[in-house]
Swiss-Prot record:
Major subcellular location class: nucleus
GO terms for MF: sequence-specific double-stranded DNA binding; zinc ion binding
Record bears the keyword Magnesium: no
Localization per record: Nucleus
Database matches in InterPro entries: Znf_C2H2_sf, Znf_C2H2_type
PANTHER family (alphabetical): KRAB AND ZINC FINGER DOMAIN-CONTAINING, ZFP617 PROTEIN-RELATED
UniProt keyword list: DNA-binding, Metal-binding, Nucleus, Phosphoprotein, Repeat, Transcription, Transcription regulation, Zinc, Zinc-finger
Protein name: Zinc finger protein 784
Annotated source species: Mus musculus (Mouse)
Entry function: May be involved in transcriptional regulation.
Compositional bias of kind Pro residues: 1-12
Zn finger limits (C2H2-type): 64-86, 100-122, 128-150, 195-217, 223-245, 251-273
Length: 297
């Protein structure tokens, strides 16, 4: 009688605490081919980017270290750009090859600055953050273009704000306006009108229009007539006022040859031709005549 064979051991199921295997290191050479890591090349750990649209918190300075020298960097893209210099030196790219060719994908960039920005495409990092809204960018140039829409002077970190008596930007106003802009963005502000009045939150397409509007609240009249000294909030209004002194009437109606010294009265007059007096659109002929006489005298 044959002896019964013992039951095979039942393999134990892995527990949740068992560590997952570490991802392998990837060695990249100038033509982009992964190879077996020799001792004299750079080992770059694979970085998985799951969401390039999110804006993660920036890592601490010196989080990513170079394998060939003591240098440390805050961003993986900065480390890649630095290690590109080592690879270029070892492969002789600085003499016979292309020193601005990405050693990850082989893409040739116009120059070192473009190459530095190009490496962020591989890592998904967006290190250039807007201080006025949650958006972040991969390069400095698009950040500057974006901040200009907020009213930030190019090349500075200061917004175009009313100043104090010493000529310095008013930090309190900056804080108030920043809060208004953020609140408008959170509430779904009007598309195409990113600039909000800091007094009433009225949106505008251009920062210059917003500043002109804010003078209604502050009472500021920086444009003064050189003849009578009257002040105005906008230069265009001052130009129209100056025509009262010069007698210039450049706006002519093509239907009745009447002339006007400002475009506002000219547009009101034109509506009377197309809609007629008393139609509810614009002013009646009598109202227009009295308005024109009072402003053109």
């Amino acid at each position: 009688m044959a002896a019964a064979r013992p039951d095979p051991p039942i393999p134990s199921s892995p527990t949740r605490e068992s560590p997952s295997p570490e991802p392998p290191d990837l060695v990249l050479v100038p033509d982009g081919r992964p190879v077996t890591p020799p001792g004299d090349l750079i080992e770059i750990q694979v970085v998985k980017v799951t969401d390039t649209t999110s804006v993660p918190e920036p890592p601490e300075p010196g989080s990513f270290h170079c394998a060939l020298c003591p240098a440390a960097f805050r961003l993986v893209s900065e480390l890649l750009f630095h290690e590109h210099g080592h690879l270029a030196s070892m492969e002789g790219l600085g003499q016979d090859g292309d020193p601005s060719r990405c050693h990850v994908c082989g893409h040739s960039c116009p120059g070192p600055a473009s190459l530095r920005a190009h490496y962020s495409l591989h890592t998904g990092e967006r290190p250039y953050r807007c201080s006025l809204c949650p958006r972040a960018f991969k390069a400095l140039a698009p950040l500057l273009r974006h901040q200009h829409r907020h009213g930030v002077e190019p090349g500075t970190s200061e917004r175009l704000l009313p100043t104090t008596t010493t000529g310095q930007p008013n930090s309190r106003v900056a804080q108030e306006r920043s809060e208004v802009v953020m609140a408008a963005a959170a509430a779904g502000a009007v598309v195409g009108k990113p600039f909000a009045c800091r007094f009433c939150a009225k949106p505008f397409r251009r920062s210059s229009d917003m500043r002109d509007h804010e003078r209604v609240h502050t009472g500021e009249r920086p444009y003064h007539c050189s003849i009578c000294g009257k002040g105005f909030t906008q230069s265009s209004v001052l130009s129209g006022h100056a025509r009262i002194h010069t007698g210039e009437r450049p706006f002519r109606c093509m239907l009745c040859d009447r002339t006007f010294n400002n475009s506002s009265n000219f547009r009101k007059h034109q509506r009377t031709h197309f809609h007629g007096p008393g139609s509810g659109v614009g002013e009646s002929r009598g109202q227009l005549r009295s308005s024109s006489v009072s402003q053109e005298s």
